[in-house]
Every structure is written in C-alpha cells, then in structure tokens.
Regions:
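Conserved small/polar residues in nucleotide/adenosyl-binding loops
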Residues: 251-258
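Low-complexity, intrinsically disordered segments with a bias for serine/threonine
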Residues: 23-24, 259
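Solvent-exposed alpha-helices and their adjacent loops that cap or buttress functional pockets
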Residues: 137-141, 225-226, 243
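Internal, well-folded beta-alpha domain core
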Residues: 166-227
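Short linear motifs in low-complexity or flexible loops
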Residues: 7-8, 12, 19, 25-33
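Active-site helix-to-loop segments that bind/position phosphate- or nucleotide-bearing substrates
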Residues: 36-173
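TRNA-recognition modules of translation machinery and tRNA-sensing kinases, especially anticodon-binding
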Residues: 248
Length: 260
C-alpha cells in the first residue's frame, strides 16, 4: 500500500446554545472536543489517501467469496468453467486497483435531531447519524473513523466492455470485482486497526449506512466529510447509490483498550 497524508483544514466547532446560557460560562463540550483532537493519534486523524493493489502489489480475491457472488451453493463446477473463473479472477487481481481514504472525527452523542431523538454527530462535519443501532454503536465513543474505498471507473468501463463481448465473462468479472473491493476494504480497515493498536487503542466492529436502522441518506455527507469525490472519485446519487458501483463506505470507533 502506498500512503500519503493530506493536511486537514480544522474548522471551528459550532454549538447552538440556549439564549439563557451565561455568555461567560465555559463551553465544556468544545473543551472536550479540543481535548479529544489533541489526544487523537496523528496516524488516525487523516484524511489519509491510500492506493491498494496493482501489478506490483496485487490484492488477493477470496475465491469462496467470489463464488458466493456468482450464486454458487456447493454444486459441482465443470473444469472448463472453473478454468474460466480462475482466469478472470487472476486478471482482476493483476490489474484491479483500489483507492481509499479515511479520517477520524470526535463523536458528539449529547444532542438531539430535529425530531427530538438522540443522534450521533461528527464534530467538524455536517454529519448526523440517526437510528437506534448506530447510536448504541457510537454513543460511548470518543472518535469515529470514516473509511471509503472504490475500484474506480476503469473497473466500470472494463465491465461494460466485457458485457458487450461475453456476458458470462462479464458476470464472472463482476463477481470477482465485488470480492476485490471486499479485500481492499479489509486492507484499509487493517491499516486503521494497526494505527489504533500502535496508540494503545482498539477498534470496534465495522458499521455502514443501511445496517440496522441507520439510513442510507447519511452516505452523501459522510463522503463529503472525507472530500471523497475529489480525493478518490467516489460520489453518491440522489437515490443513495454509490458511483462507481464497486465502492464501500463504513465507519468504526477507535477506543482505549480498557474501555468497558
């Protein structure tokens, strides 16, 4: 993996306070946020842009995962088809390249959304994560690391070209690409976990919009928090579909190891 760091513009935190509040009172939430940012390991802060795969350091495809995407449920595969599947898989491994980006933000679980329900806000962004599942996942967290990864438009164009030449090869290529993006996300997540571990932190399990009751509508703002369109060419449509299609967006929470 090839890694470079882009400086992050730190915008001031804004909190709406009741008009009755003492203007001389200390903003404890802002102080806590500043403290969290000071204590956050630099390797996790980001944004960090990562290139994964390619001819020099190819990503490996999980063959069982690829077969699952093809709808395989254990039935026998004829030798000719098995060879064809393996040929396409090796081609995707050799030429597939993923771009990823991640950044970490302080978590604010102290506010309510417009409907008066508890929510998660990522300080320094316009991200509000709604839903009981994500609230339970992050309510005690100090930080949230947002990760995005994509195989890019070259993969999309290759898939379309194969569709015109050989629908079977296109189906295999599509399944192999789905397995490849899973591999890339695993590598990106491992980088975050390694950085957290080096700082005495551990990460909880990965979560994505669409899991449980966390709505897909949050994807656009999460990608904006990473400036993912400019950095890795990843965007989201008004119908919440990510483009390019072989892309993933997720988040995790690095926390002290002694956290209960």
């Amino acid at each position: 993996a090839h890694l470079h760091h882009e400086p992050t513009e730190r915008r001031p935190c804004r909190y709406e306070c009741p008009s009755s509040r003492d203007p001389l009172a200390v903003d404890t939430q802002t102080e806590a946020t500043s403290s969290n940012m000071r204590e956050l390991p630099g390797a996790l802060a980001g944004p960090r842009v990562v290139t994964l795969g390619g001819t020099e350091d190819p990503l490996a495809i999980d063959r069982n995962e690829m077969l699952r995407y093809l709808g395989h449920t254990g039935q026998n595969i004829e030798d000719d088809l098995a060879c064809r599947i393996e040929r396409v898989a090796r081609d995707v491994e050799a030429h597939g390249r993923a771009r990823g980006v991640f950044a970490t933000f302080p978590v604010d679980a102290s506010t309510l959304d417009d409907e008066g329900r508890a929510c998660i806000r990522l300080t320094g962004t316009v991200v509000t994560l709604r839903g009981r599942d994500i609230y339970r996942h992050l309510k005690d967290a100090r930080w949230c690391t947002v990760l995005a990864c994509t195989l890019g438009m070259d993969n999309e164009r290759r898939l379309r070209a194969l569709g015109a030449q050989s629908p079977l090869d296109a189906a295999i290529y599509d399944a192999a690409s789905s397995a490849l993006i899973e591999s890339a996300v695993g590598h990106l997540d491992s980088m975050v976990q390694d950085a957290a571990s080096a700082a005495g932190l551990s990460c909880n399990w990965r979560f994505s919009c669409g899991y449980g009751d966390c709505p897909l509508e949050a994807q656009g703002r999460l990608l904006a928090s990473l400036d993912a369109t400019r950095r890795i060419g990843l965007t989201v449509t008004p119908t919440n579909r990510m483009v390019p299609s072989k892309s993933c967006l997720l988040y995790t929470s690095p926390s002290p190891r002694d956290r209960s």
